[in-house]
């Protein structure tokens, strides 16, 4: 297989017929138009303000909406706010809200819900702030029922992107068990270990995004062989799989593939010995053969990375970093010796156990590191434990994981700011922090150059070993149309339909 950088649709029509329960309907309710698809892991939290998992986000984007939304290109479009104004000094944002929106629990959407949302997220409501993104927010006020003004302490060019955050209804306290949003799909149920069910929102305000299906059944199924079996037997209508797995399908399917703006990385804890020595981190850069990982783990369906940026972010992407580190074991050994580690050392790679490709990648890396006398032990841990141990507490030496795509470069590169709570790489460079701050108030042209310099700084410091952007692979029944890729995690159920 060859690498692909653009969406490919390959019809796989084979001779074997598959028979099972009826396609597109549930066994119990044959009068509904149903799509059955999988998600790789359990939802980490049904409350969108508390969730951190990309799989959860991909599904629940259908349930929740922000003041602004995004299209297939990543461009911002009106959401719950039909328009907005930004003051000349960049400090005041005025949002003009839709007046025809109803939450799934029947509550009419209005300015009070926006005020509640942003006071909760920023801590302005008196409680502990739920998101560091809104620490710059000094006030949020309802001008009238459908106009809200937000004021910032300092101008921030990324702020509008942040308003994609889910707006939740004031006074509703059951989000973690029975989530309520305004989106085109309504949460019906979650059966732990089995499935999430979403129903069409019959009262959805936007006719252009009105779902064409009645119900989506999202099965929690991360094992590729199980997904393939379910597709083959007709128990799934669509499946999220890995590239090499799709070749094993027989029957009438379409394989959709596209880069997903994800960064798979071998993250090194920069504050822990021996990774507090930049020479060791640089040695690892030279010792890891990314082509071997891309070909062996992802069957060639991935794009090699050189910093924490995918080429999908073309406007901001620094294409001058591709030759900074090339696979060179001798150079890696030289750097290890300079750092005093000629005889190597032992490390642990802590990997979330529900992501097989990250485990596979860790296994390849472990073999490669033997060439520089590094003995790597792979420690698979459950997703919840990984989130607490690594993502929250940075209590690890190394990890292999995928960082989800973001629409604004500040969201991507802000992960490495020294005081960012989820900087689990523990990267600390005051000059880098300064560049990120400068970018907040810079012009569009200046931001491009600042973010390119940030990428160079991360690469020079070898803050992590960035591996690849794995292609997203979605297999659908040949009559199921409308599957659309986005530069962030999103399974857009509203676009799916069956061709008659």
Q: What does each model-found stretch correspond to?
A:
Residues 85, 89, 129-171, 189-191:
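Surface-exposed binding/hinge segments that line
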Residues 139-141, 188-197, 217-272:
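Extracellular/periplasmic solute-recognition and catalytic clefts
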Residues 38-88, 119, 180:
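N-terminal lobe/hinge region of extracytoplasmic solute-binding protein
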Residues 110-117, 145-149, 183-184, 212-215, ...:
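Alpha-helical secondary-structure segments
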């Amino acid at each position: 297989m060859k690498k692909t950088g653009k969406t490919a649709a390959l019809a796989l029509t084979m001779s074997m017929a598959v028979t099972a329960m009826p396609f597109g309907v549930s066994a119990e309710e044959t009068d509904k138009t149903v799509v059955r698809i999988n998600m790789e892991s359990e939802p980490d939290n049904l409350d969108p303000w508390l969730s951190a998992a990309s799989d959860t986000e991909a599904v629940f984007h259908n349930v929740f909406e922000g003041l602004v939304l995004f299209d297939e290109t990543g461009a911002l479009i009106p959401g719950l706010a039909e328009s907005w104004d930004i003051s000349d000094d960049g400090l005041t944002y005025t949002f003009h809200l839709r007046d025809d929106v109803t939450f799934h629990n029947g509550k009419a959407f209005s300015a009070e819900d926006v005020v509640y949302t942003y006071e909760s997220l920023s801590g302005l409501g008196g409680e502990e702030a739920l998101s560091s993104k809104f620490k710059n927010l000094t006030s949020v006020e309802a001008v009238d029922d459908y106009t809200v003004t937000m004021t910032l302490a300092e101008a921030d060019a990324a702020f509008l992107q942040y308003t994609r955050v889910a707006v939740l209804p004031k006074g509703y306290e059951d989000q973690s068990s029975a989530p309520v949003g305004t989106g085109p799909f309504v949460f019906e149920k979650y059966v732990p270990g089995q499935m999430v069910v979403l129903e069409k929102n019959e009262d959805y305000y936007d006719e252009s995004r009105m779902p064409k299906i009645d119900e989506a059944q999202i099965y929690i199924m991360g094992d590729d062989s199980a997904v393939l079996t379910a597709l083959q037997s007709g128990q799934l209508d669509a499946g999220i799989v890995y590239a090499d797995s799709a070749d094993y399908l027989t029957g009438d399917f379409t394989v959709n593939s596209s880069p997903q703006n994800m960064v798979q990385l071998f993250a090194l804890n920069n504050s822990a010995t021996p990774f507090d020595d930049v020479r060791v981190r640089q040695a690892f850069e030279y010792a890891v053969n990314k082509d071997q990982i891309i070909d062996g783990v992802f069957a060639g369906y991935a794009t090699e990375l050189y910093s924490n940026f995918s080429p999908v972010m073309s406007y901001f992407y620094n294409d001058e970093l591709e030759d900074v580190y090339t696979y060179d074991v001798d150079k890696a050994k030289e750097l290890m010796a300079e750092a005093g580690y000629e005889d190597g050392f032992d490390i642990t790679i802590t990997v979330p156990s529900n992501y097989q490709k990250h485990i596979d990648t860790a296994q390849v890396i472990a073999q490669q590191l033997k060439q520089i006398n590094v003995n790597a032990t792979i420690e698979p841990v459950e997703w919840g434990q990984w989130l607490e141990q690594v993502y929250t507490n940075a209590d690890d030496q190394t990890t292999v994981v995928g960082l989800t795509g973001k629409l604004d470069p500040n969201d991507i590169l802000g992960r490495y700011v020294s005081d960012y709570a989820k900087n689990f790489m523990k990267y600390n460079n005051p000059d880098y922090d300064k560049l990120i701050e400068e970018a907040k108030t810079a012009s569009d042209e200046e931001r491009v150059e600042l973010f390119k310099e940030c990428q160079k700084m991360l690469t020079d410091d070898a803050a992590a070993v960035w591996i690849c952007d794995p292609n997203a692979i979605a297999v659908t029944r040949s009559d199921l149309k409308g599957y659309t890729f986005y530069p962030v995690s999103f399974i857009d159920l509203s676009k799916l339909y069956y061709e008659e």
